[in-house]
C-alpha cells in the first residue's frame, strides 16, 4: 500500500503546476537552479535564494527557513553578454550619481573626498574631449619624511638600519653603473656622449 504522504526532498512538479507556471509567464529554466538531477526543480520564489533547512540537511526539506535577496547586478555585468561597450556610459553614470564603484559589482553611495572629486572631474573633462592636465604626484614630501626617519634611526646606532642604508646605497650605485653601460652600448647616445666629451676649440690651450 503506497503512502499518500508527499515525500520530503526534491520532487518533480506535476503537470498542473507546470501549466500554472507557464500561465504566469515564468520560464522553467529560471526556476531550475544548479540542478544535479534532470527534471527536478527547487521550489524557490523568483528573485530570492532559498537556503536548505538546517534541521533537515540530509532530506533537503522543501520548506525554507531563511530567504536572502540575490545580489544586484551592475549595469556593466548586465550588458556584457550582449556585446555593447558601456564603459563610457557607466563612468558618466557613476560620476552623475556620486557613487563609488567596487570591482565586485556593489555600489556604495558615499561622499567623495577632495582628491577623488578632483580626479573624477579630470576624467570627465577628458571623456568630454576637452584638454585637461592630470594632477602630478609629488612624492618629494614622502621621501623627505622617510629620509628624516632613516637618519634619526641611523643616529641612534641601530645596526639593521645601517645595514639597510648600506644595501640601498650599493644598489643605487649598481644601477648607475648599469645605466652607464647601457648608454655606452647604444650607438646614437654613445656618439652624442663622445662628441660632448671631445675637446672643443674654446677649451684648447692657446700656444
From Swiss-Prot:
Primary localization: virion
Keyword flag Transmembrane: no
Cellular component GO terms, alphabetical: virion component
Cellular compartment(s): Virion
Record carries keyword Isomerase: no
Keywords: Virion
Biological function: Structural protein that is not essential for the viral replication either in tissue culture or in its natural host.
Further remarks about this protein from its record: The gene encoding this protein is included within the N gene (alternative ORF).
Family, similarity comment: Belongs to the coronavirus I protein family.
Protein name: Protein I
Source species of the chain: Murine coronavirus (strain S) (MHV-S)
Amino acid at each position: 500500500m503506497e503512502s499518500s504522504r508527499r515525500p520530503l526532498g526534491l520532487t518533480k512538479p506535476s503537470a498542473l503546476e507546470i501549466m500554472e507556471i507557464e500561465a504566469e509567464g515564468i520560464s522553467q529554466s529560471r526556476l531550475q537552479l544548479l540542478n544535479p538531477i534532470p527534471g527536478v526543480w527547487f521550489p524557490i520564489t523568483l528573485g530570492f535564494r532559498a537556503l536548505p533547512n538546517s534541521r533537515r540537511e540530509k532530506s533537503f526539506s522543501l520548506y525554507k527557513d531563511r530567504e536572502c535577496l540575490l545580489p544586484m547586478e551592475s549595469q556593466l555585468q548586465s550588458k556584457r553578454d550582449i556585446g555593447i561597450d558601456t564603459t563610457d556610459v557607466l563612468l558618466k553614470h557613476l560620476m552623475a550619481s556620486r557613487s563609488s564603484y567596487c570591482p565586485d559589482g556593489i555600489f556604495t553611495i558615499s561622499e567623495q573626498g577632495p582628491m577623488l572629486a578632483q580626479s573624477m572631474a579630470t576624467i570627465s573633462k577628458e571623456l568630454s574631449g576637452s584638454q585637461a592636465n592630470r594632477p602630478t604626484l609629488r612624492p618629494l614630501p614622502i621621501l623627505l619624511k622617510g629620509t628624516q626617519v632613516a637618519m634619526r634611526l641611523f643616529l641612534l646606532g641601530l645596526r639593521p638600519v645601517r645595514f639597510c642604508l648600506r644595501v640601498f646605497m650599493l644598489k643605487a650605485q649598481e644601477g648607475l653603473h648599469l645605466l652607464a653601460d647601457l648608454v655606452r652600448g647604444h650607438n646614437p647616445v654613445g656618439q652624442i656622449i663622445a662628441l660632448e666629451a671631445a675637446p672643443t676649440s674654446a677649451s684648447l690651450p692657446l700656444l
